[in-house]
């Protein structure tokens, strides 16, 4: 029997998350907010404030400052932070965490907080590399008498001829490069490049002038490099300070039995010492002074910040005042509440007053019924769902009376019911009503619990 199997495509499935539709802050060139743009609806004042923050971050004038997004649940705080990250682009580090993430049995909470601080600070290292690139026209090792005596001969240097589109060059190379060339199995007619600083040699492929040759091995034919043989290339690398910390905190061990056994055992999370971080900061500052690297302060976004305790807030105060610190964006949906880690100290948003005094607070306000309707229409389009106008009005009504999250969560089950009921036009009002009966919202569930309290365990 002939075996036939389907080949799965390599393209990823399109998944939609809660904030997939957010593409940016949706601001005009003068910094004012569009009513609806880049997937963002409403919250004009908050978006304009975030736009100013983005401009300050890009100008590198915002480092070491903290911003707070304060508002009720479902008012777009996380969406604002995500829009800020979209506006900044991929080159600026953006590290989102939740307040409860920093509690661990292995690492103390202040260490976890500092780790995320360092993740949000980038270092852009610019390195100029001198490269010799071309097609090999000559490869002659020159021998000399062995300095150790005897009849053997050693390679004193290597003569190599390289040809590019603009000319040829003959190079005299160190014998150590000859070993690298032998490893790469370079022969006359191959295209190679050699780094002048490190002596690293890489075989790119066979010159396409030899493409007509018949060979048993499948060769990759490449064109002769353009420009001169000797080139200067600027290479830009983006790393975070946390990457540097980890590289130095966990150096690769030797080849003895004990280090091999240590690598096989369950890796324990390494706690990076303050001394090591100070040493790395010294090296980073030296690079910045030399002009080799530049610091890119990123954004640390802490959602549900009221979950941090009093020790974390005290540490946050000190960390914000350090010379190398990112922009910190906090978000909380609490009003007056007890600060975690204390018995009876209440404060606005669950944050101590001394830290609150250092924050620039951006308020978010509940959405209007029209804005809720626009958001639901936008989400339905993002998820590829068709919805009729009466059904949209009903869902929007739930969004304003119950909650926006509940209204958005009704869309996908309603689309499945519409498909089962054979409605080609999309989601109708009856599907929303059926979903409403199947899935309770928080208020109705709480009402049932209070009515039938004796049937539940207390």
Curated annotation (Swiss-Prot):
Keywords: Activator, ATP-binding, Chromatin regulator, DNA damage, DNA repair, Helicase, Hydrolase, Nucleotide-binding, Nucleus, Transcription, Transcription regulation
GO molecular function terms listed in the Swiss-Prot or TrEMBL record: 3'-5' DNA helicase activity; 5'-3' DNA helicase activity; ATP binding; ATP hydrolysis activity; DNA helicase activity
Main function: DNA helicase which participates in several chromatin remodeling complexes, including the SWR1 and the INO80 complexes. The SWR1 complex mediates the ATP-dependent exchange of histone H2A for the H2A variant HZT1 leading to transcriptional regulation of selected genes by chromatin remodeling. The INO80 complex remodels chromatin by shifting nucleosomes and is involved in DNA repair. Also involved in pre-rRNA processing.
An annotated GO BP: chromatin remodeling
Subcellular location(s) of the protein: Nucleus
Entry superkingdom: Eukaryota
Listed InterPro entries: AAA+_ATPase (IPR003593), P-loop_NTPase (IPR027417), RuvB-like (IPR027238), RuvB-like_C (IPR041048), RuvBL1/2_DNA/RNA_bd_dom (IPR042487), TIP49_P-loop (IPR010339)
Gene this chain is encoded by: rvb1
Sequence similarity: Belongs to the RuvB family.
Primary site of residence: nucleus
Stretch list, region Disordered: 1-31
Organism: Aspergillus fumigatus (strain ATCC MYA-4609 / CBS 101355 / FGSC A1100 / Af293) (Neosartorya fumigata)
EC number, UniProt record: 3.6.4.12
Sequence positions that bind ATP: 71-78
Annotated catalysed reactions: ATP + H2O = ADP + phosphate + H(+)
GO cellular component: Ino80 complex; NuA4 histone acetyltransferase complex; R2TP complex; Swr1 complex
Protein name (record): RuvB-like helicase 1
Pfam families reported for this sequence: TIP49, TIP49_C
Subunit structure: May form heterododecamers with RVB2. Component of the SWR1 chromatin remodeling complex, the INO80 chromatin remodeling complex, and of the R2TP complex.
Keyword Transcription regulation attached: yes
